[in-house]
Curated annotation (Swiss-Prot):
Catalysis performed (reactions): [protein]-C-terminal L-amino acid-glycyl-phosphatidylethanolamide + H2O = [protein]-C-terminal L-amino acid-glycine + a 1,2-diacyl-sn-glycero-3-phosphoethanolamine; [protein]-C-terminal L-amino acid-glycyl-phosphatidylserine + H2O = [protein]-C-terminal L-amino acid-glycine + a 1,2-diacyl-sn-glycero-3-phospho-L-serine
Organism phylogeny: Eukaryota, Metazoa, Chordata, Craniata, Vertebrata
Listed name of the protein: Cysteine protease ATG4B
Family (UniProt): Belongs to the peptidase C54 family.
Catalytic site: C74 (nucleophile), D280, H282
Amino acid sequence: MDAATLTYDSLRFGEIEDFPETSDPVWILGKQFSALTEKDDILADVTSRLWFTYRKNFQPIGGTGPTSDTGWGCMLRCGQMILGEALICRHLGRDWKWSPGQRQRPEYVSILNAFIDKKDSYYSIHQIAQMGVGEGKSIGQWYGPNTVAQVLKKLAVFDSWSRLAVHVAMDNTVVIEEIKRLCMPWLDFDRGACAVSEEPREMNGDLEGACALAEEETALWKPLVLLIPLRLGLSDINEAYIEPLKQCFMMPQSLGVIGGKPNSAHYFIGFVGDELIYLDPHTTQPAVDPSEDGHFPDDSYHCQHPPCRMHICELDPSIAAGFFCQTEDDFDDWCAQIRKVSNCRGLPMFELVDSQPSHLITADVLNLTPDFSDSDRLERFFDSEDEEFEILSL
């Protein structure tokens, strides 16, 4: 195996290279650290991220399917990690820290239970694999980052606790109006941004309660998970995209990037110098079975060792970048940062526009309902993606 593709399975944890002694700032999901004076803080922050890896001996997918995702599920696990980070930000906050060996907050337990390897967990490997069948992917088949993004968008609809608005940007374009329609569906944008739908909604026959809820909703914003599938080059990443990509990790709304190299997928959470920092799903651990109260040993869901690093030029150009906006102000701030980055050196990775060009308007924009044909358009754009990644056998 090439040294550049060493994984946690092929290295003893004690042999993983520590962070370099460098004056270059370390950026992890919108936070800046010093490798010279804050190494413990860096490792604590990395350890607090959810780490989803291959698992074995879980319930058969679909009742008769695989009981392990080793060799084919790495991109699915990366999708779990980027969404897991969104749920952490949603329910616990970006500054939350994991404390090993201690009883955790109920919100944390609920988040982990959403990813447990069983069929009735919102974002389990079972749900992702079976939902992928609707995207034309058979169970056990490789997923590209755009397919994972589309599947996560579908699954989030059923997560009433988190109440996320998951948006997958199409055609390398982020449309501000489209996102605000999604995150504030109770506003009538056709009559003006401040207009509220006048249709009464019954809640168990209680119109007064419905009105109270409507008043509450007008002050709310459905927390946004924005996933942007991108292609930053042909066979290799275009160096003009390197600085804009780094800037994404510096934004407080950053959820990181899923992607990798031609033979494996990784979850990228930051960078130092010209090296990307990532969590690697390529180690196989036994499936965890929660107790009746929902609690279970959680050590295996946190990487308690220095994360992996790779030179940014080794990144496969097909990626999906993620961002989380808890409030409308967060989203407006993100838009301002993106416009600033677009005016700096390098090529913008995607376009940010106020409204959707008429020739690109889709039923999803008009109806505000999940349009499962979105992935078809993305697959045509990324039609070579799945062939470029190879299944990694360990």
